[in-house]
């Protein structure tokens, strides 16, 4: 009997299985979910997760771009984990769901990385 490769444990996951995945705090409290991923066209690496909150903290109409390195997969919750408090989320750079973030503006991207204290995926700071 052939085994289904989707049920075998491994570290790779299809992008369509990441989109919609829950984002939780380390204690398991629900924050939101991953709306979509942003992938660097040249390197093929995931650069950002775009988070949706569905009305959480009054930021439901906005999406938050989060550097991918801020998330960790938590096998216990089968969700991505984000160690962030409510105030940090409220102040986080965001954009309206009906408009896209200006991905061509490196200064805005650099500001985003500074906010989260993470080096940009393209190098420098």
Regions found by a protein language model. Give the residues of each.
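Peripheral interaction segments used for macromolecular assembly
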Residues: 1-125
